[in-house]
């Protein structure tokens, strides 16, 4: 119980790699000793926080101007989504830790559209209704503008100005994000 409390207290989405490691640790602990219900509200808050982060990344991709300078920024945003989405799914199964989520993540990453209905049905039985409404569109193969509408429906603080988001990113504690944003602004 103390380990779970300590790990949850260390969750900080400014460093996604550390965040991912902490969620991996929480999942490993939950598979041995289920996380009690009073921690589930904290985990639900984390699910919303990380889902909002993924929708924000998608929104930035959607707002990214289609020009010759977009390659590095687009690659960074896609990489961040691919790095963050599995952690969101792992957070979502902490209350049912025996779920073979790693297999499902691998299936999602493979991009096989024939397996998508199976995955969505599985998540139908694992995630709460609210979690499904937020998480499933991130798994489905949707156009960016449709995913953008869903993000704006669920989260009121979605970015609306790409240049403003770039300026914020320059001052990010994530040095890679800061460098890429600065590089993009200079060109």
Regions found by a protein language model. Give the residues of each.
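Boundary/linker elements of alpha-helical solenoid repeat scaffolds
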Residues: 1, 34-38, 68-73, 82-89, ...
């Amino acid at each position: 119980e103390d380990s779970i409390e300590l790990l949850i207290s260390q969750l900080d989405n400014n460093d996604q790699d550390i965040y991912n490691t902490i969620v991996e640790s929480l999942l490993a602990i939950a598979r041995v000793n289920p996380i009690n219900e009073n921690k589930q509200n904290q985990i639900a808050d984390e699910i919303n926080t990380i889902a909002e982060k993924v929708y924000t990344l998608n929104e930035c991709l959607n707002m990214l101007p289609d020009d010759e300078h977009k390659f590095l920024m687009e690659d960074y945003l896609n990489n961040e989504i691919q790095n963050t989405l599995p952690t969101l799914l792992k957070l979502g199964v902490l209350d049912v830790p025996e779920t073979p989520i790693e297999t499902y993540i691998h299936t999602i990453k493979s991009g096989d559209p024939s397996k998508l209905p199976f995955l969505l049905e599985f998540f139908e039985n694992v995630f709460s209704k609210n979690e499904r409404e937020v998480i499933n569109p991130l798994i489905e193969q949707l156009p960016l503008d449709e995913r953008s509408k869903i993000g704006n429906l669920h989260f009121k603080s979605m970015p609306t100005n790409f240049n403003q988001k770039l300026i914020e990113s320059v001052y990010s504690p994530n040095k890679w994000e800061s460098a890429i944003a600065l590089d993009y602004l200079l060109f």
